[in-house]
A protein has these predicted regions:
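Membrane-interface amphipathic/juxtamembrane segments adjacent to transmembrane helices
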Residues: 40-48, 142
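Selected transmembrane alpha-helices and immediately adjacent juxtamembrane segments
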Residues: 1-31, 38, 111-208, 269-288
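Cytoplasmic-side transmembrane-helix entry/capping segments in multi-pass membrane proteins
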Residues: 45-46, 83-88, 266-271
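Hydrophobic transmembrane alpha-helices
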Residues: 45-47, 53-63
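Interfacial loop-to-transmembrane junctions
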Residues: 36, 256-274
Length: 288
């Protein structure tokens, strides 16, 4: 019972910390929907296919709420699959402050961010330019040259207050995130971090494949765990990169919540793991 309450308390604390940004993000979305929908459509029509570049740069902001916003925009066909992929790849959320707290790792942090931006841009370009003509429409989704409706939720209320509308959508997502955080926290409380670290240490060259899988867990705490394992020497730089590349914070959870196409969600999840694992294994050959 104590294990249950500890996991629930941790989930509540993590979720409450995220609430202010999520609310501000949804408040911004509501405002954009009601006042700048047409201008956003015109801007996207003029160069929406290159959105993966700003997506890669903005994804480096150390918080996981931005990936949630990107998921909403993708589900609303406002941004391309390459853009949301770039945001997911570039997202590192809580790992950045943790690594920045170690002066000896500042060079590593700069290298990590540079590599993530580079892989995010390349991955977004591949998905949006050459692969767009190969992938079936049912898997691709997202922006198609026009924005039918700039809407980041399932429902939109023109007559309601934007503050109340943003609060309602924030609370809806908060409940979904809280459930994920509680389940993951319960697993960590039950098994502990040491067995996880031991399993990672014995993986060798295939370690990035496992850390990328761990990184898919839609919880900001996972990036902290990966950063701590790297600081403690339990995983390599390539494995850290793989986990943080596959880790999109709560972005994946929100994507599965708001995007109705399970095929697109599964494709994006699998692609994110593949990019993280492949990039991490590539970086394994470097003395980092």
């Amino acid at each position: 019972m104590e294990l249950f309450f500890d996991a629930l308390l941790d989930a509540l604390i993590d979720g409450v910390k995220m609430l202010p940004f999520l609310y501000l993000a949804y408040l911004l979305i509501e405002w954009l929907e009601r006042h700048h929908g047409e201008s956003i459509e015109e801007a996207l029509a003029g160069g929406g296919r290159w959105g993966f570049i700003p997506g890669a740069l903005l994804g480096c902001v150390p918080q996981c709420g931005f990936s949630a916003v990107a998921s909403n925009l993708y589900a609303s066909r406002v941004i391309t699959p390459g853009t949301v992929l770039a945001v997911f790849i570039a997202t590192s959320d809580e790992a950045i402050p943790l690594l920045a707290a170690e002066p000896s790792l500042w060079v590593t942090l700069v290298l990590l961010l540079a590599c993530k931006v580079a892989f995010a841009i390349v991955g977004g370009w591949l998905l949006d330019i050459p692969l767009r003509h190969i992938l079936p429409h049912s898997l691709y989704g997202g922006y198609e040259g026009h924005a039918d409706e700039v809407d980041c939720h399932e429902e939109h209320e023109e007559t309601s207050s934007i503050f109340l509308a943003a609060l309602r959508h924030t609370l809806e997502i908060f409940v979904f995130i809280l459930l994920f955080s509680f389940i993951i926290g319960l697993v960590f409380e039950a098994f502990g971090e040491e067995p996880i670290a031991a399993a990672l240490s014995g993986m060798g060259v295939f370690q990035p494949m496992l850390t990328a899988l761990v990184g898919l867990v839609p919880n900001c705490a996972v990036s902290v765990l990966l950063a701590q394992l790297y600081v403690q020497g339990a995983i390599t730089f390539g494995s850290l990169f793989a986990g943080l590349t596959a880790g999109a914070g709560v972005g994946l959870a929100v994507l599965w919540r708001v995007n109705p196409s399970w095929k697109q969600n599964l494709f994006m999840t699998g692609l994110l793991w593949a990019v993280g694992a492949a990039a991490g294994m590539l970086l394994q050959i470097l003395p980092l």
